[in-house]
Amino acid sequence: MGSISSLGYSPDEVWQAYLRRESFLKSEPFDNENSAVARLSKASEDILKVLRIEEPAHRYLDRTVLMAMHCAREAVEQAGWTRSDIGYRTGVNIGSSRGATTLLEELYGAYLRNPSNRIFPLTSPMTTLGNISSSVARDIGTAGPEISHSVTCSTALHAVFNGIAWIKAGFADRFIVGGAEAPLTGFTVAQMKALRIYTNDSDAEYPSRPCSSETPPVSTMALGEGAVLLAMEKKSADELGDSKDRVLGIVDSFGYGLESPETATSISEEGVALASAMNMALYNMASDNPVDLVILHAPGTIKGDCSELNAIKSVFGSELPILASNKWFIGHTFGASAALSLEYALLMLANDDYAEFPYPVVFKNSRRPIRKIMINAAGFGGNAACLIVSKPAG
């Protein structure tokens, strides 16, 4: 696994950041108005700077591509894959809700300011969504399938699903999967504010407060940036041999759902799509052990949080698992959010611990051993996805 976000870029650093229970959302000016966002740490930003000057071709790459490139290298190294392992039987599927947001807005802004000037010749190839996975595939040396896609905020989980399908079908032996997103631009923040869901508490200790019990309820969504990629393959315990210590988690099952849009953000009060996704994942579980913890999608919006909690109650009844979130730490990272949640899940499985909400919420958690975790994601268009991962044996 490789990651980069406001939390840091190494597993130990990220886990320690979670344990501190501090928000990484900071107030910044956007179009003469302050907004809370979670940017990469300075050390993480330095990594991107080094990547950008590493080769002439990297000079024009968008932040999403550079973040994904770093994460892929880390994931391959952590998995112990060699160049000879990778070959044409290794695939890449990286999702992004919006793709090359930063670069596209910069280039389009330059065009609007002076449309008579010749635009940058590489504008089209450098801003297409497919540029993320193709750049990563070249960087790690695979000749296998490379896929980029957007399923809005469920994007990263669908990348995992695709990887599973390719491997199970026998078309690939291993896959790099995950999501990358860099949405911290003036136009993107303005879009969220137009929906009236962005937090107005940019200077608060916790600008984003998913599932808060405060009254009257308020929407407190905020944006962050980051990427997480994971190395995935199908192996038995015997096949793993001495490399079993490299296994971070086991995919138990997954589910997906879709509902007809009822609102501008395609959310129903009952959370129909999420309930469908969770029920499918629970029905297809490989083991009988119950889900101990659910990492919520909960974006910090009134309707979004309420919808998901209603769906969870309809699926689990009165005996709820632990409910956790990382959006009060790092904000909503759109297409990368579920990948960051998956990273959080794997760290929780490794440490048998989680970060409790630092403010009052509308439910009460009861601590228990954490062996199996469900990750939820939902997005514009009425789609939802759910992944269940388990702690490796031993």
Predicted feature residues:
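Structural signal for terminal/edge beta-strands and the immediately following C-terminal loop/tail
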Residues: 367-394
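Acyl-CoA/ACP chain-elongation machinery
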Residues: 171-218, 254-269, 296-306, 320-363
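Active-site-proximal alpha-helical scaffold in enzymes
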Residues: 68-78, 129-132, 137-140, 146-181, ...
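Conserved catalytic cysteine-centered active-site region
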Residues: 26-66, 99-162, 194-222, 303, ...
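Conserved active-site "lid/cap" helical segment
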Residues: 12-93, 100-101, 273-290, 315
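Short glycine-aspartate micro-motif
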Residues: 89-93, 172-177, 210, 372-375, ...
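Condensing-enzyme catalytic core mediating Claisen C-C bond formation in acyl metabolism
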Residues: 1-3, 11-12, 16-29, 33, ...
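Conserved small-residue
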Residues: 18, 72, 92, 136, ...
